[in-house]
Amino acid sequence: MAYFSTATSLLLLVLSVSSPYVHGASDCDTLVITLFPCLPFISIGGTADTPTASCCSSLKNILDTKPICLCEGLKKAPLGIKLNVTKSATLPVACKLNAPPVSACDSLPPASPPTANGQAPVWGSGWAPAPSPSKGNSLIPISGFSFVIVTALAMFRI
């Protein structure tokens, strides 16, 4: 038991040190981890019809703190957990929150540390409710985000 937790922690450390995202997106990784309570609602095979209060609270915190991190969470990929992107896009509406549309993620630079003049990149002023789900099923694997989720689940035995 302790061996598994130690091995998982060591693996996480090694992968995070070698990750190209470590320096620019570590703040986002920390924020995205708080969305674990949303997995039953946004993951493929998730059984929740509505997000929990804890999920909505975490989403609100990210939107208030660094909304670009939601894009980072969707852009990162490989390890296991797959998100239903269509359902993920409805999360802000389900939580009764305003958020930039998912389509805005493509036009944004990756999250990064403050620029040379000391200012962080700005998200933009295009705030609007997330779009309603369309017919069909948009599914993509989400990896970096997935790795963090899988590791946390293993460590906390959720």
From Swiss-Prot:
Intrachain S-S bonds: C28-C71, C38-C55, C56-C95, C69-C105
Function: Probable lipid transfer protein.
Sites of GPI-anchor amidated serine lipidation: S134
UniProt-recorded name of the protein: Non-specific lipid transfer protein GPI-anchored 29
InterPro entries referenced in this protein's UniProt entry, alphabetically: Bifun_inhib/LTP/seed_sf, Bifunc_inhib/LTP/seed_store, LTSS, Plant_nsLTP
Name of the encoding gene: LTPG29
Tissues in which the UniProt entry reports expression: Confined to the ovaries of the inflorescence.
Domain of life per record: Eukaryota
